[in-house]
Design a protein with these regions (language model features):
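Short phosphate-binding loop-to-helix
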Residues: 65-101, 159-162, 190
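Short aromatic-hydrophobic micro-motifs that form the base-stacking/packing surface
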Residues: 103-105
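Conserved donor-nucleotide/metal-binding helix-loop-beta segment in metal-dependent transferases, i.e.
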Residues: 111-136
């Protein structure tokens, strides 16, 4: 199978990136934390074998260009009015460019490591949908064998029901869903502290 993965990331713009961390870290600290998480994700996906990887940014930014060069990863721009539209577009683009199974992954889920992604790749031949549920009720990774616009439209992004609603829609459509182990994302100050503790980061970013 031809597999493809789009890593989604926001441009590191002060005041617009990791806003829930700003109270604890300040604007510059939140941006630095975001960059560290993106680089963690890029390091993990760069270790994958047999899967095309792309970095999909929210907007053009010099740091993104530097990441593209440093990690030898193609750079793309997200398109769409909301997160669902942007994910659907990225999945559709990957599938239309020859991928037999395509993934979209968030950049702030540190436990989506090479082993997890290798597992997801191993399930792609027997699934219509692969999803990595997050502790906050969302998900950090979704993969599809075919475009499924209904999984992304009218979804309450940012709520704790995104995963449950996505799963329900997929099952009602008769899609075969494979669910991975629960993951967590870095969104709040306590998540950042957890990341620092588990991944050996010390002090402020």
């Amino acid at each position: 199978m031809s597999l493809s993965l789009a890593l989604f990331a926001k441009a590191p713009v002060p005041g617009q990136t990791k806003t829930r961390l700003q109270g604890a870290l300040g604007q510059s600290g939140a941006v630095a934390a975001h960059c560290q998480l993106v680089e963690h994700a890029l390091t993990e996906i760069s270790r994958l074998k047999g899967m095309r990887t792309e970095l999909w940014m929210s907007e053009q930014h010099p740091v993104a260009e530097a990441w593209s060069e440093r990690f030898a990863i193609p750079l793309r721009l997200q398109q769409g009015v909301d997160l669902g539209a942007r994910m659907h577009h990225a999945l559709q683009q990957q599938l239309s460019c020859g991928a037999s199974f395509a993934f979209v992954m968030g950049c702030d889920c540190p436990t989506l490591d090479m082993r997890y992604l290798d597992w997801a790749a191993s399930q792609s031949a027997q699934a219509d949908v692969i999803i990595a549920p997050a502790q906050d009720g969302g998900y950090g990774l979704i993969g599809l064998a075919q475009p499924q616009a209904h999984l992304f439209t009218g979804m309450p992004w940012g709520s704790d029901s995104v995963y449950a609603q996505t799963l329900l829609r997929a099952e009602l459509s008769g899609l075969k869903v494979v669910t991975g182990a629960e993951i967590w994302d870095v969104d709040r100050p306590e998540d950042w502290t957890r990341y620092q503790r588990l991944f050996g980061c010390q002090g402020r970013p």
